[in-house]
From Swiss-Prot:
Highest classification ranks of the organism: Bacteria, Pseudomonadati, Thermodesulfobacteriota, Desulfuromonadia, Geobacterales
EC number(s) reported in the record: 3.6.5.-
Organism: Trichlorobacter lovleyi (strain ATCC BAA-1151 / DSM 17278 / SZ) (Geobacter lovleyi)
Protein name according to UniProt: GTPase Obg
UniProt enzyme class: hydrolase
GO cellular component, one term: cytoplasm
């Protein structure tokens, strides 16, 4: 399935039905009083979060969403039926914004969470409502109230406990494949991962947690370089970031400069993301060149007081120690504090 995490919608609630102008007409009562019924209210437009969806793909081709209008009132004091509410289902983690102003209208973070975003218009009153002692036969009724309209921007931010980040081809997909049932595409070239991938990690006696493999980040990502800032937002909800660093290319490559560049990108994207706790995983420890530079790399990160764990997703070396560190940090604070 194609991963879609942003979509624009044109939304409207239902108009209210019009009130009816009608008079009682029966045999021997040619000039009966008014009996026009009220119009029904228009349907509300409601958003509901559901775990059954993982992408906004279904809405990409349904960009106009409108609730049903209320039925018009009728004679014999019959009221129009209310318009049916329209429930738009979205994945858990969907942020709803006003397209024009960018104002956040809703943040749906729980399964089953609902919000009435646009209220349906009220139904108009029929002429029976307007009869008075001085006007016993009103020949007018109220029109239905118009529904609300709004252009919305929906953004999906993945609800992951752990966000994996690093340069393209740093070993993120290999790690999530090793520790979960997720099976992202893996190959020896940059940008193998073109969409976020989620994996559930069940580990020892800890509660299971969700890990997200985010497409590789390069310098300028906050401005859209590489796969762009559209994926940085998925790290914002993570409780902890695991930054994977490949030192097997030393001395030709400079993983330390890359590490600092990626962290600058996080800080430029959002201050909160730049300050989020990180654990470093030194990947590809099954390669001799990575082993050669291990002591140097550990010293570099330890000087900066950054927890560092050498791992190999190929052999499993060090993976258990990394998962221990992740789990201990995750359950040290409740999720609402992340």
């Amino acid at each position: 399935m194609k991963f879609i995490d942003e979509v624009t919608l044109h939304c409207a609630s239902g108009h209210g039905g019009a009130g009816c102008v009608s008079f009682r007409r029966e045999k021997f009562i040619p000039f009966g009083g008014p009996n026009g019924g009220d119009g029904g209210r228009g349907g509300d437009l409601i958003f509901e979060a559901t775990k059954a969806l993982s992408t906004l793909l279904e809405l990409r081709h349904k960009q106009h969403q409108k609730a049903e209008r209320g039925r018009h009132g009728m004679g014999k004091d019959r009221h129009g039926a209310a318009g049916e509410d329209l429930i738009v289902k979205v994945p858990v983690g969907t942020l709803i914004k006003d397209f024009e102003t960018g104002e956040v209208l809703a943040d749906l973070t729980e399964d089953g969470q609902r919000i009435i975003l646009l209220k349906g218009g009220r139904g108009g009153q029929g002429n029976a409502r307007f009869a008075t002692a001085t006007n016993k036969a009103p020949k007018f009724a109220q029109p239905g109230e118009e529904g609300e309209e709004r252009k919305l921007r929906l953004e999906l931010k993945l609800m992951a406990d752990v966000g994996l980040l690093g340069l393209p081809n740093a070993g993120k997909s290999s790690l999530i494949t090793k520790v979960s049932a997720a099976r992202p595409k893996i190959a020896d070239y940059p940008f193998t991962t073109l969409a976020p991938s989620l994996g559930v990690v069940g580990y020892k006696n800890y509660r299971s947690f969700v890990m997200a493999d985010i497409p590789g980040i390069i310098e300028g990502a906050h401005e859209g370089a590489g796969l762009g800032h559209r994926f940085l937002k998925h790290l914002e909800r993570s409780g902890i970031l695991v930054h994977l660093v490949d030192i097997s290319g030393l001395p030709e490559s400079d993983p330390y400069a890359a590490f600092e560049a990626i962290n600058r990108e996080l800080a430029m994207f959002s201050e909160e993301l730049g300050q989020k706790a990180q654990i470093v995983g030194l990947t590809k420890m099954d390669l001799p060149t990575a082993q050669e530079h291990l002591t140097e790399a550990q010293a570099w990160f330890q000087e900066r007081k950054i927890p560092v764990y050498p791992i190999s997703s190929m052999t499993g070396e060090g993976v258990e120690a990394l998962l221990d560190a992740i789990a201990e940090r995750l359950w040290a604070a409740p999720r609402e504090e992340w």
